[in-house]
Amino acid sequence: MAIWQGRSLKKPSGGRIVLARKKRKRELGREPSNTRVAEQDKRKIIRTYGGNRKVRLTAAAYANVFDKSGKGRKVRIIRVIENPANRQFARRNIITKGAIIETEIGKAKVTSRPGQDGVVNAILLEE
């Protein structure tokens, strides 16, 4: 079933709002990508509003981790330690922006949106 992101058809009082038009395709949404930690990266290209394209990362194995000096490295993701978006995401190894991930070189905080950007960028946390 599609996700409709249009205005509610109910008034605050509970009464119905009768629209003078049908639902529009532009008001449709999609399920979240829920990027997981995996053995190799998996990307999906989807068509978006205006015929544009969005790269959706569905499975991630590597992250671009940057240190304080700005030097970056491509490192393997081991697991998700903490995720402020939802505490169940850490248990399910789902990566979102703001998640703390464990990598080969230490803990890092995700700064990109993997479901929107198609890549995991992170900054190294000092321990």
Swiss-Prot record:
Signal peptide stretch: none
Gene Ontology cellular component list: ribonucleoprotein complex; ribosome
Keyword Electron transport: no
UniProt KW Transport keyword: no
Molecular-function GO terms, alphabetical: structural constituent of ribosome
Domain of life: Archaea
Keywords: Ribonucleoprotein, Ribosomal protein
Record-given protein name: Small ribosomal subunit protein eS8
InterPro entries assigned to the protein according to its UniProt record, in alphabetical order: Ribosomal_eS8, Ribosomal_eS8_CS, Ribosomal_protein_eS8_arc, Ribosomal_Se8/biogenesis_NSA2
Pfam families registered for this protein in UniProt: Ribosomal_S8e
Family the UniProt entry places it in: Belongs to the eukaryotic ribosomal protein eS8 family.
Annotated gene: rps8e
Organism of provenance: Pyrococcus furiosus (strain ATCC 43587 / DSM 3638 / JCM 8422 / Vc1)
Subunit structure: Part of the 30S ribosomal subunit.
GO biological process assignments: translation
